[in-house]
Amino acid sequence: MESFEKRPRGRPVTTDPAAVGLTALKLFNELGIDKVTMDDVAIEAGISRSNLFRVFPSKAAVVWGGMQRITEELKNQLANNPETSVVKHLHQSWVGALSVLDNSLDTVRLRLKLIASSPEVYGWGHAQLEEARKILEAAIAKIEGPNSVRPKMISSALIAASMSVLTWWAESDDQRSITAVLDESLSDFESIFAQLAQGE
């Protein structure tokens, strides 16, 4: 591994997860995630290695941090949304769940750029994305019934489309909020399928 030059810094960053996470993400983006160790992150953040691992036990935890908040908010959104149309129910609830990210756009953009940069990094989040997908699948099955492939198919399509939109947003440096971009994109997605259905 290339030698890592310690950067000059002023007041050390505390073990606040947001501050430490942003420090790590900047290093990963600037130097390459494969070239930065967690020890390097601890040095740059001005904290001990043990304190770093209490906050983030791995690189994957840094990059995919925040997914637990999204899945918890998704459960709340789905439970409290009275919409009976499956499409509208999922659209509104998923966009609402991702609104928790709108107050940390710089951090989220760095995370998504890293996720888009490598299939391996993307794969680190498979379990968390699958958890969100299963929550969506259960919500669809509750409305439509469980005895078909549709709940799994629709939930999988929503996750895949959303990740495509979010990584595009990060790489394009679009200045809109995540929810604004996702809301518009999902509306377009719905329109495309509506047009296809009308053409049958």
Give the predicted meaning of each segment.
Residues 103, 129-155:
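Hydrophobic alpha-helical bundle segments that form small-molecule/ligand-binding pockets
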Residues 1-3, 138, 142, 174-200:
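C-terminal peripheral helix-coil segments that are non-catalytic and often amphipathic
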Residues 72-111:
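Hydrophobic alpha-helical connector segments
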Residues 101, 112, 140, 165-173, ...:
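Secondary-structure edge/capping motif, primarily at the C-terminal ends of alpha-helices
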Residues 115, 148-169, 180-192:
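Hydrophobic alpha-helical segments that form the core
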Residues 1-31, 35-47, 64, 69, ...:
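Basic, helix-initiating cap at the start of DNA-binding domains
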Residues 60-62:
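A secondary-structure capping/hinge motif
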Residues 46-56:
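Short hydrophobic/aromatic patch on the recognition helix
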